[in-house]
Structures are given as C-alpha cells and as structure tokens.
Amino acid sequence: MTERKREYKDRKQKKNSPKNQSKVTKFLKWFFIGVLLLGITAITIVGFYVLSIIRSSPELDVQAIQSLNQPSILYDDQGNFMDNVITREQRYVVKSDEIPDNLKKAFVAIEDERFYEHKGIDIKRIAGVIASNIKGKLSGSNTVQGASTITQQLIKNAVLTNEVSYERKIKEMYLALELEKHLSKDEILTTYLNTIPMGGYQYGVSAAAQRFFSKNVSDLNLIECAYLGGLTQAPTSYDGLSEINKENPSRYLNRTKSVLFKMHELGYISSEQYNNAINEIDTNGIKFKPNNKLSKTNFEWFTRPTITQVKQDLMNKYKYTQDEVDKLIANGGLKIYTSMDRNLQNNVQKVLDDPNNYKAITNNPNEKNEDDVYKLQASATIIDYKTGHVKALVGGRGEQPAMSHNRAYYDLKSIGSATKPLTVYGPAIDLGLGGAGSVVNDSPLTNKELSSTGYKDQPKNEYNSYRGPLTFREAIKISSNLAAIKVANEVGVSNSIAYGEKLGLVYGPHSRGISTTALGQFQNDPNNPDGGNTYTLASAFGVFGNNGVKTNAKLYTKVLDSHGNVLLDTSTPEEIKIFSPQTSYIVYDMLKDQVESGSAKPAKFGNIPVAGKTGTTTGDKDYLFAGLTPYYSAAIWIGYDKPREMRTSSGIVTSPIFGKIMGLAHKGLQYKEVEQPSGISKIAVCMDSGLKPTSLCTQDPRGSRVYYDWFINGSAPNQYCNYHTNSHVNNFNKNNNTTGVNEKNKKQETKTEEIKPNENNKSNEQTPNTNPDNAPNNVPNNDNNNSNNIGGNMIPPQNQTENNTNNGVITPNQSINNKN
C-alpha cells in the first residue's frame, strides 16, 4: 500500500469516528433550531405587523355601510318629494326582493362561488393566490393578485380605497370577517349589488339595468343577468355600448357565456336554461336598449345647483374631502329640504318656454340646434331676499338633456347696464359723492377724463346722442353710458370692484377697468369666466329692499343625515352689509322710475311697487333685467348659447317676462312698500348745476329748474348755483325772445334768494354715518382724487354752454325712450 493510500484511509477513519459524527449531529441540531427560531421570529414580526395593520384599520360602522342602501332625497319647500339625488356617479337603490335570483346567482357564481360557505374570507382561494403572488415576486413581475370575496369587495367599496397593497388587503380581510358577524349573507349581497361599480358613472345593478337595457332590475332576463354579472370584473372591456365592442362583440359575449357556464356548473340553472341561453347569444347576440335619460332629475335646473351648494357647505363645515362628500351625497341617505316653490318653478318654466315672449327677437323662437335644444335661450331666478331662500331657478328653455349647463347658476356672462346700480350709483351715494338729485353731464369725455378712464376713443350712449345735465335719477333711468363712466370714475375702479365682489360679481384679470365697472362689459375669457348670472343678480338686487344687507342666497333650508341629525341649517341667514340703509332706499327709489315711466313699464304688475334695471351687452348679444319688490328680487337673462346680435331692446323683451313671473310669485300678496329709513331728506337742487338753487333757478325760460330729490342727511350740496345768474337768465330770455317770465319773476330778477327745503319732504333729520368708511373694508375712497364732481355737482358749470339746446342736449324732464 502506498503512502498516499495509507493517508487517505486514515482520514476516512477519522471522519467516520464517533467524535466527528457527534459534531455533525450537533451542527444539524443547532441549524434546525436556528431555522426554527428564525421562523418563529419571522412569524412574530409578521404577526405584530399584521396586528398593527388591523389596529390601524378604520372602525367598522355597520350602519354606515347599510346606509349605502338609502338614497339621498330632495324635498320641496312644503316637504314633498322632489328628487332622488343623482350625482355624476349614478346609483339607484333597490331592495333584495326586487333583485332577480338569477342576478344574485350570476354574481355569486363568477365572483365568489363559496360565498354562502365562508365567513368573509375564502381560505382556499387565498392559498392559491399567495402561491401565485410568490411566483410573481420570484419572476420579477411584482403582480399582486386578489382573492376578494363579495364581502371583501363591499368593504373595499364602502370603507377602503382602491389601493393595491398588502396592507389594504389585510385590513379588507379583517373588516370582512367583522362584517359577517353583524349582517346576514343576503344583507351583504344586496348592499354589494347596490354599490358595485358597473362602468362609466353607473354604480349598482339598478343603474346598470337602466343604462344597458332601459329596464327595472326586476325585469331582467337570464342573459341580461349573466351579462351584468360578468361586467363588473372589467367594466370598460366588457361594455357592450362602446364603439370598439360594437365592432367586435366577442369579448363581452364570451364573458357572458362564461358566467352562464359557471351558473350551470354550480347547479344554479338547468341544462335546458343554459343551452337555450347559449343558442340565443349565438343567434342574436345580446340586445341592448340604452337609456340616454338615465341621469336626468325631475327638477333638473334646481336640483343640481342644490347638490353643488350642499356639497360645498358640507366641505366648509366638516372639512370633508371632495371624495368623502361625493360618497356622502350619493350614498349617505341624506334628506335635503330645498327652498323651491314647486308651483312657481313649474310656472316660471312655462313662461320662459312660451315662444310668444320672444317674437320681438326672432320669428322662429323655437328653432333648435343639432342637439334638439332651442337656440334662443333664457334663464330666471326668484329669491326671497330677506331669508336668502331661492324660490325658483330655471336654467334654460325647453326640454334639454341631463347635465345640460345651467344658465341661471353656473354660466357667467357680461351683465351690461344692470351693473350701474350695483357698482356706480350705489357706491357713489354710499361714499357721500352725491344723492339722487346730484347732476352729471351726459357729454363727451374731456381729454382729462379720457386719460383717467383709460379710453382711447370716445365712448357712446346707446341712444347715440348727448343729453347734457342729468340727475343721478334720470341718468340711471335712461341708462346714460357717459354719465355712468363719469360717476364711476369718481367712485374709483377699486371701490366699484370691491362693492361688486361683495355683491357676488366675478372680476377676471382682464375685467378690472372702468368699462367693466361702469358698463358691465366683462371679458368672459373661457379660461377665466367672469361676470354674473340671474342667480347672482337676483341676490345682489335684493340689497336695495333689505337695508343694504345682502343675504347669501341658499337653495336649501336644512340637510339631515340618515338618522335625522341636522347637518346643515340655513334658518339663520348669512348676511353681509353692503350699503347703508339710506343708500339702499335711495337707489331703490331711483330704480322705480325705469318701471313707472321708463323703458321697463311692462315689468309692472298689479299694485305692487317694482324697481329694476335693464341690461344690454355689447352688440345686443345678451338682454337682462334685474329688479325687486318689497317681497322678492328676481333676474331674467335672454340670449343665444352661441352669441348673436338680437334685433330689439332689452326692456321690450325682458321686462314683460319679469312682470309675468313676478306676478306669479306675488299671487295673493297684499300691497306694501319698502320701509323708508331715517336719515334721508328730499333736498332742493338746481337740475342744471346740481347745487343749492337760488330764485334765479326758477326764472329759467324753460321753466323752473328747481328739483327735489333724496339725499342722505349731510351729503347734499352746500354751495349755491353759479349757473343761473342775472346775465345768464337775461341772455336766455333775449336769445329765445322769451316772454314767459311773469311779473313776479321780473320783480325778483335782481335777487338770488335761497330756495328753502320742502319741510313735507324731509324725513327724520338724524344724520347717518355718511363717511366713506361705509365703503368695503381696506378700499381707497377714490382712485382718481378729482376735486370736481364731488357732492351734489358732478359737472363743472363753467364747462357748459349757455345755449345747451344748440348742442343736441335735451333737458332732463323731457320724455326719453332709451334702449338700455
């Protein structure tokens, strides 16, 4: 034996010796102990991890989950049913006995065949999915497959998010086990079938039955049940109404057959039923009958803005996220009590629909567009401005598709001259710059005025002439653009915008000049919508009957949760002080003139006082009228969705409609007036200079130029008229060969006596706070700081010609028909 062989044999003997075998055994022993300890440690860590996830799970609110079976409902102002809430996520709740057995079995067969056997989770299914997921991890696919039972899917839809993660899956499994302890299988299945996503905006089998087959869920046949059962796995892929599936229906047809096969395999349907259904699909496919009116509510114009407002108020009060409030509104069983007067809402709709109201605009008011909607449109809003409750809101004419844009609430447009009481004359009076009897010159802008207002070219009046000296009352009655520009220039753009924003108007970045504040010409950039609508205007004009206080408009009175607890309550109005009571009354009194003797006479109805203002936008593309009575405020808009010029004037069309709908709103109401506040007086002024009159102002050959109108105490002019002088009156008489001055006046022609105020026209002499502090907070009092035009005299008399009549100027007391 060689030496090498002897060494090998010795080593082998040593290796097999009892001592070495003991070492191997010891190693294996400790190895397995280590593995065991490692396994126990891992299991412990995983256990604590799972436990921590379970502890972080949201609390299971069984009542909240069951409330998913309670639709939110809207009621009118009398507490009568009005609408079910239909959000963009459409869901119609049905009871268990309304759901066909075939539909229940279809879902169980394809989604969770051991549903009636497990306690919330399917262990057998979980084991298979775990193996598949481990394989995916090892292969690098990182795909997490689900093993969700119907109970787990309900938990995911009702409580958790759609996040794909192990943490969410663990929470889902734990909560599913808990839910099964509280609800029966039928309760779980019914709630699941009412909430399962079914493609598009449809949630629940009832909404899906309507969308695909225009049927109540209880009327579905076997094939239709099988189709809906298979849809939920991949709603987009199996959507039989999609264009791609219309061209190639094999995907959803095969899926439906798979559901039928599984139902037959589990014994839910007989062989005969199965074979007949398969033959029907092979021969005729699946017959769909889509319902295009699925998402339309009974009171579309009022209901959708109400839902929008309730959502916003819930988010503001309870700090809900958008997703949370969407689910609460859609599924939370809320009871929303609206302020809608059902009869008034229906009757206002009838008035707006009536083609006879638009004959002055077009010979074919009912011409329709490609969507079968009237081209000529209108909107209207009526508000109880004391409470802020909206009584009627109509967003368009005629029958329109669901989710049509609401012209009364959502659309923003230019408002034309309807802005003048809100951002011109109201602020001017409120800031102490004048009163109803103050005078402004309706004449071309001077170079200084062109510069300060930013106009490059001379702006014009709608009536294409100049009227000379006008009182505020007359200027707003005839809607003088030049007068409004001059007064707005004194108020200041920033002041006007501050008032306008508080009143609800929206000013975009390109709508912050004097053409907007004086004339209501908003840019309405599609990327920055601005302006107003009938909802904002009706609310804004209410301030003139409510002591200058704007009550925020509300479409609902209260909102209750599914247990009857009050979530929202508008019984206490949200109020914002805009103008002083004195300002608001004076503007209200001025606005009555356009209805009593101006271009808006048809707005008058019965014996109820009416005040209002017309509005026309550039190019006659929008007609508006906004106004109020001692009871309600309202606004009307008429125009085309694709703007075009209209061939008449705003007052001719809008004011009759205003009169009709407000007549309906005031049916049975007694005469009353807006209460006159203390702190205002009717003061004598000269209607040419706007200053305190002298006896010479009565000797004008045109007749006495002395005029009485409302001023806030302390704001009337304190300087005497410097327009009517002896020489001025004599020149008038000489130039006009006037013999109309009576002997009494001849005796007085050398005197300049003060005209005393009419004591009968004075109210309580308590002086109100007429300081510009009444302006909105943190707003400068005047942008331009011009020294003239402040107080009673808005025009420098020295700039007036003596013979005004030769310059196309007519006197303010003449009858004027104005388009605006």
Curated annotation (Swiss-Prot):
Residues 732-820 are annotated as: Disordered. Residues 732-742, 767-807 have a biased composition (Low complexity). GO terms for biological process: cell wall organization; peptidoglycan biosynthetic process; proteolysis; regulation of cell shape; response to antibiotic. It catalyses: [GlcNAc-(1->4)-Mur2Ac(oyl-L-Ala-gamma-D-Glu-L-Lys-D-Ala-D-Ala)](n)-di-trans,octa-cis-undecaprenyl diphosphate + beta-D-GlcNAc-(1->4)-Mur2Ac(oyl-L-Ala-gamma-D-Glu-L-Lys-D-Ala-D-Ala)-di-trans,octa-cis-undecaprenyl diphosphate = [GlcNAc-(1->4)-Mur2Ac(oyl-L-Ala-gamma-D-Glu-L-Lys-D-Ala-D-Ala)](n+1)-di-trans,octa-cis-undecaprenyl diphosphate + di-trans,octa-cis-undecaprenyl diphosphate + H(+); Preferential cleavage: (Ac)2-L-Lys-D-Ala-|-D-Ala. Also transpeptidation of peptidyl-alanyl moieties that are N-acyl substituents of D-alanine. Residues 808-820 have a biased composition (Polar residues). Its EC number is 2.4.99.28, 3.4.16.4. In the N-terminal section; belongs to the glycosyltransferase 51 family. In the C-terminal section; belongs to the transpeptidase family. This is Penicillin-binding protein 1A. It comes from Clostridium perfringens (strain SM101 / Type A).
